[in-house]
Amino acid sequence: SQIKFKPSYIELAVVADHGMFTKYNSNINTIRIVHEMVNTVDGFFRTITSFGEWRERDIIPRSCIMASTISKHNPQCIINQPI
């Protein structure tokens, strides 16, 4: 079955205050990394519009998913260990 989510919104504000800026040696690249991380997380949440769960059985064999997708990014799959 698949659960459809009602659109919901989260307002997020991230502030790199002066204390944080000086803590990291006034390195503007550190601030840029924080900005990139926030944009990445925002991108994840924009794409999650539904969630499916398979209670009775796996509809897609897990080995197919791992072989084609996950193993590229997950070292645990490369060594054939459970996630």
Curated annotation (Swiss-Prot):
Binds 1 zinc ion per subunit. One of its GO terms (molecular function) is toxin activity. Its main location: secreted. InterPro entries: MetalloPept_cat_dom_sf, Peptidase_M12B. Keywords: Apoptosis, Fibrinogenolytic toxin, Fibrinolytic toxin, Hemostasis impairing toxin, Hydrolase, Metal-binding, Metalloprotease, Protease, Secreted, Toxin, Zinc. Ca(2+) binds at E11, C77, N80. Expressed by the venom gland. This protein is a zinc protease from snake venom that is devoid of significant myotoxic and hemorrhagic activities. It hydrolyzes the Aalpha-chain and more slowly the Bbeta-chain of fibrin and fibrinogen, without affecting the gamma-chains. It induces cell detachment and a apoptosis (anoikis) in endothelial cells. Monomer. This is Snake venom metalloproteinase BnP1.
